[in-house]
């Protein structure tokens, strides 16, 4: 039962989606002329069938198709005036040029997993359009060079599947949830079960094609190293629209091993979590053991780049308290492990190409980083939070290994050496009227954890977007650096200033903007 509950949470985290239509409100009067002029401009370069106005019969289904958090499926949500579905980079260029010319800002959606929905909605009324990358999802693999080009609209599952089809000897270090869009994931860093071996997805990006705020299509050489640095972990949308990415593929062995061991409180879960927080970051980088803590216990979930025999020897030597043995092992290919970890034994390689889900839930998320071990006595207090009304789950990923050998300034993603593990607080509920308890639980446990996590700043992961951390203030039609610094240093630490200076060079008028976009520092 505990294992099935853990799989259920994993599926919710990875695949919450919706297909229902929502009520549409009429655009405000000031938007009328903007809409007409913008549409006229777009239709010069983009086929009309790829444009959706609010008056279009298909608008609601297109907009909601990848809304992963259904609390935003509401007539109160501020939606785009237009949705543009490009099929090539020239369509993206046209959208930006027309948007600049006619005062229409652009937001960008790849997979729709932005936890706060900022890729397809606005917190406040304003005229904007969404460039929905869903139709740009090509994956091209060069097995000999061990590289791939992947469009931003592809899902991680598309990329993983394409890699394995080209070569069983290659893999890529990105997220566990296979329905996540490449564009947003890479833009925020992106990590999964190969984090300790190969770092983040962004660490392994070697080129990109970006449409900048002037509508130019730039590769790495043309954009320059500061711009290229910024798109690899500086958060989506701030520095242009990435049409496609070139990534370095990494070797994986013929067989990998996974295990999932659940321990209840009465089976010593608290002792094991206390031990895990120092053992897991110090293990060889071929082994990643993460934890999903919920209710009365914890699930220890692992990927090992090697055989069951070798893994049992390693666990017996380094973490014997867990009691892991050969009966817990499942050997498989790397690509088979990709669906197995989030979906369990029923997950298949073909599932990686699935872009839909019938699961519908509301959600709230927060994140933390732990730099010092938490005493057992405090873990006992933490676990009491997991049985409170409205409680969710704590997902904990260990660092160390390869990720710790990279300088903090190598990319905007700054979590490298000195981090034991990160925490994602996740809570789901069903039905609009049920929001109060789970939402408050998330904020309350976050407050409770203050003494145990990073400080000055209290760090967070930008791909676990959280508007509780702060939002931009706009003065003179430009986001202010002071307001952005409040939340920005939590995501990026000392890299935030360089991001803001880069923004000031390439988009000083702050065209690409949302509630947590990088402000220009001039």
UniProtKB/Swiss-Prot annotation:
Return the InterPro entries for the record: BBE, FAD-bd_PCMH, FAD-bd_PCMH-like_sf, FAD-bd_PCMH_sub1, FAD-bd_PCMH_sub2, Oxid_FAD_bind_N
Q: Which SUPFAM superfamilies match?
A: FAD-binding/transporter-associated domain-like
Q: Which residues form the signal peptide?
A: 1-25
Q: Which cysteines are joined by disulfide bonds?
A: 41-98, 308-329
Q: Describe its PTM?
A: The FAD cofactor is bound via a bicovalent 6-S-cysteinyl, 8alpha-N1-histidyl FAD linkage.
Q: Which UniProt keywords apply?
A: Allergen, Disulfide bond, FAD, Flavoprotein, Glycoprotein, Nucleotide-binding, Oxidoreductase, Signal
Superkingdom classification of source: Eukaryota
Name this protein carries in UniProt = Berberine bridge enzyme-like Cyn d 4
Protein species of origin: Cynodon dactylon (Bermuda grass)
